[in-house]
Amino acid sequence: MKDDLSVVLCGEAGQGIQTVERFLTRVLKFDGFNVYATKEYMSRVRGGFNSTEIRVSSKNVKAFVNRIDILVTLKKGAVNHLKDRVDDHTVILGEASNVDDGYKFIEVPFTKIATEIGDRIFSNTVAVGTLSAIIGVDFKTLEKYLEEFFSRKGKDVVDKNIQAAKRGFEIGEGLVKEGKIKVEIKKDPNVKDDLLIDGASAIGLGAIAGGCNFISSYPMTPSTGILTFLAEHAKEFGIVAEQAEDEISAVNMAIGAWYAGSRAMVTTAGGGFALMVEGMSLAGMIESPLVVNLGQRPAPATGLPTRTEQGDLLFALYSGHGEFPKILLAPGTLEDAFYLTQKAFYFADKFQVPVIILSDQYLVDSYYNISNLEVPKVQPQKFIVETTKDYKRYQLVENGISPRGIPGGEGLVDVDSDEHDESGHITEDLDIRVKMVEKRLKKFDAIRAEIIPPEFIGPKDYQTLVVGWGSTYPMIREAVENVGDKKMAFLYFKQVYPIHPDAKKYLQSAKKRIIIENNATSQFGQLLKLETGIDFDKKILKYNGMPFSVEELISRLKEGR
């Protein structure tokens, strides 16, 4: 096998697949291996088929691949579940009872070994030991990790897990010595000091770095992980974490928190965001900052609640009745998830507008090793003013951004969902109405001055331009780099609204324009056409609930060249 290995574990929900994933990825990282992992799972607590992909490489990897080099099957039917990804080079490991008929496999008696040690629960540790040996992990690293992880459960549990890992490790060593499996992956000692976090944690850390001190949400996949992350660290960072009774309450709590001087966010998915749109409009009218993480998943309605999609871009763009500014960010990497979330609080506070972070199931559930994230050495910049007796919350100013005060000063901070005058008092004066609409829309000029530019990757004399946004970034980039076209470039948007003015220049310079999106209607393509007047020659779309793989994008990009 090459120096890039794709290991997939497949079984039923509740069987411990995530336990194996957690053990193995952390052991690999601690031993100096670049590691990436993502998962696909059904919407059920028990049964069905769940799988996790662990990619180990000599270089840093961030993208999902279709191929399976080693498949560990923990349930009958697992191979058939993944049959489109299994080919002749796939090595299948498992017990005979768990391998579907017609497939060649190497029998590894995980359960039998675990039972001999004392309990079938140790079968997961046996599997970790086997895979660790195949990949080339130092057993001392594995042993140390198990000692630290199980120390709170007592010496007996620690000893039995080490014994289980050792038995599995010996099997893996035997397979390598017999030449049945060959892996040549180089270690990088610098990886040992890297972070190993998922997208939900990266967004949560970004919120903390951005000064978030209030989160109100109703749990909804795939955004729940952000709520739980901030709740777990609430005391440490002075965060009020509120699990609201519904999404309507959640968004209004957040708006109220901003009014009082906090930095607040809400997390939700498409169905929950549908309930929040009236609150979005309220934020637009009272010019309240607001940060929303919208975790996208296949819709309409409940759709596929545990799968991924980029289907809510236009919904987010046009959310909330009436015309008012908003900002849409779409992280494509864990680093982006951190920095863009941090930036979201800056944008929301400075421009007094809602900022929506468009994540999705693939992004929040994927993780890989990254270098340490840069946390600001100074407190996040805030834009609150001390009010005086003559304070006017909606003072008509040149750039449309009135000084924002909070209760506690000498002035009255009057906000209302009705149209209002400069002091915030309800009015039906039609001239004032026009001035207030124009005031709110003037913010676009200030926002456009700070738009995050798209990232251009490739030759300056490109002929084909591939465009992507959000979580498709890692797969598109790896595909473009390996498609074999020296005249192909990639333009990645991490801010999808407002559109950076350079977008038109990049699109005009290409002879052929291709857009790649995880939706059925090319929503970003529509938006770019609306903003630039330029359409795409080819649209590569996927909407079955799965992310693109590197291989399928290479194949699709080669079509019709």
Indicate residue ranges for each PLM-predicted region.
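Active-site cofactor/cluster-binding pocket
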Residues: M1-G210, F214, K505, K512
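Gly/Ser/Thr-rich loops at beta-strand to alpha-helix junctions
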Residues: G14-I17, A133-I135, P219-T224, I248, ...
